[in-house]
Each structure stands twice: as C-alpha cells, then as structure tokens.
Amino acid sequence: MRVAVSGAAGRMGRLVVKNAVAEGLKVVQAFDINEVGKDAGELAGVGKIGVPIEDDISKLDADVLIDFTTAEAAMKNAEVAAEKGVRVVMGTTGFTDEDRKRLAELAEKVPMIVSPNFSLGVNIFWKIVEYAAKMLYEWDAEIVELHHRHKRDSPSGTALKLAEIIRKVKEEKGIEADLKTCREGISPRESEIGVFGIRGGDVVGEHTVFFFGSGERIELTHRAMSRECFAIGAVRAAKWIAKVDKPGFYTMDDFLE
C-alpha cells in the first residue's frame, strides 16, 4: 500500500510518517511547504526512507493521501486527490460549511474518510456523550476544550462535533438548542449549548462536557496525552480506506464498525 502524507513536516505529519513506517506501509510521497528537500523519514525520527519533502501536490501518485494541513491547503489537496483517483484520509479541521459540502462532492469520485479526531478514545468518548445526552436531554450542556497555543481553529472540530451530537439528541426530544461560542454581559441562560476554547502552552488536547441538573452535575472528560493517538488512528484508517472500493464520504463510525 503506497501512502502520501501532506503536511509531512508538521507536528502531526511527522507522527503520521513515523507510524505509517511502523505499520509496514510504504510512504512514497511527502508534501509540505516547509523543509522542502529534506528526507521525511529523518524529520519523523525514523531515519532516511528516501522520500524528500516536496511542495507540488499536483505530482501526487499514491494509493492513499493522509492530510494534516490547513483547511485551505486541504481543500486543494482533496481536489487533486479526487482528480487522480487517490483515496483520502482527512484529519485537517477548520472547514467551513461550504468546504464540507465540496468535500462531500469530491467523495463521489473517491473513497474519503473525514474526521476532526482519529483517536480511538475520542471516538468512544463521542458515543459516551451521546448516551449521556439521551438520558439527560433536559439538563444544561456546556463544552470546554483546551489546546496548545499554536492551534489554528477555535472551537476545535472535536468540540463542535460534541456540540452537534448533543444538539441532535435535544432536537429529537423536541428541544431547540443553538450553539453558543462566547458570552458577554449578564443575561439569563437560554436553550443553548455553550462551547468554549482555551489556548495556551503545549496542551495536546482536552475536552470536557458538562451536564448540569438541579443540585448536581456530571463532567465527562477526554485528555490526549500525546499526538501519537491521532496519528495511529489516521494510519489505521488509511489501511481501512485502501480496501474500500465504493466512493463515498466515510466517517470513523464506518471504520470502527
């Protein structure tokens, strides 16, 4: 199985290269606008693999592309991959609704798995939160997420998915709940789901969902201790999508099932 990695010089990209090599996959291309010409394996700490970093995605030639870049770059990369018939594992976040619509259109050409978080723990966490939301749909729900100071998007894609899970459950129970990403001044709490992002230091990622009842509350938390969990999940998703013949917009639920 031939794998290309876009964003290969970044924090996540290096870990993807490292774990792809560890899983016995053949990394054949590595794309980034930084560290051009350097060996992707050396950057990943696994020694030379004979794959230099290049910055021209139009040269893409692989079975699967694993993307951890920026939303803008990822959209271009997905366009090229779809045109060339290359399957896509998309770990980039920060997409607009229009971007997601376009990704779904591109997925009509090639199998594509898109997730704001490839960690197995987070995907189980989503299921736990959904179960709790069904039991506690009348309770107030708030989400707080913490990430390192360099994270580009806020709230995180993982937090937004948590909010969407809770919103859908409430909607099924006849409760309208809007997403609230900031509050200012003093006002009564309306039917809403608050999502708040904190940025600082080198926090890999932490998400806490609060359910507030009368005289009690439940807190559910997932903490990523290392980015390794995201890379491992993405590489395993790549091995899965490589065996999928039917084009489509797949999620981690499809992979886990």
From Swiss-Prot:
Q: InterPro entries from the entry?
A: DapB_C, DapB_N, DapB_N_CS, DHDPR_bac, NAD(P)-bd_dom_sf
Which pathway, per its entry?
Answer: Amino-acid biosynthesis; L-lysine biosynthesis via DAP pathway; (S)-tetrahydrodipicolinate from L-aspartate: step 4/4
Q: Name one GO molecular function term.
A: NADP binding
A GO BP term here is: diaminopimelate biosynthetic process
Q: What is its main location?
A: cytoplasm
Q: Does the keyword DNA damage apply?
A: no
Enzyme Commission code: 1.17.1.8
Catalysis: reaction(s): (S)-2,3,4,5-tetrahydrodipicolinate + NAD(+) + H2O = (2S,4S)-4-hydroxy-2,3,4,5-tetrahydrodipicolinate + NADH + H(+); (S)-2,3,4,5-tetrahydrodipicolinate + NADP(+) + H2O = (2S,4S)-4-hydroxy-2,3,4,5-tetrahydrodipicolinate + NADPH + H(+)
User: One GO cellular component from the entry?
Assistant: cytoplasm
Keyword check for Oxidoreductase: yes
Q: Where in the cell is it found?
A: Cytoplasm
- Superkingdom per UniProt: Archaea
Pfam families (alphabetical): DapB_C, DapB_N
Spell out the catalytic residues.
147, 151
CDD domains in alphabetical order: DHDPR_N
UniProt keywords (A-Z) are: Amino-acid biosynthesis, Cytoplasm, Diaminopimelate biosynthesis, Lysine biosynthesis, NAD, NADP, Oxidoreductase
Which residues are NAD(+)-binding? 7-12, 32, 91-93, 115-118
The residues the record assigns to binding (S)-2,3,4,5-tetrahydrodipicolinate are 148, 157-158
Role according to the record: Catalyzes the conversion of 4-hydroxy-tetrahydrodipicolinate (HTPA) to tetrahydrodipicolinate.
Family, as annotated: Belongs to the DapB family.
Name of the protein = 4-hydroxy-tetrahydrodipicolinate reductase
Report the source organism. Answer: Archaeoglobus fulgidus (strain ATCC 49558 / DSM 4304 / JCM 9628 / NBRC 100126 / VC-16)
What are the top taxonomic ranks of the organism? Answer: Archaea, Methanobacteriati, Methanobacteriota, Archaeoglobi, Archaeoglobales
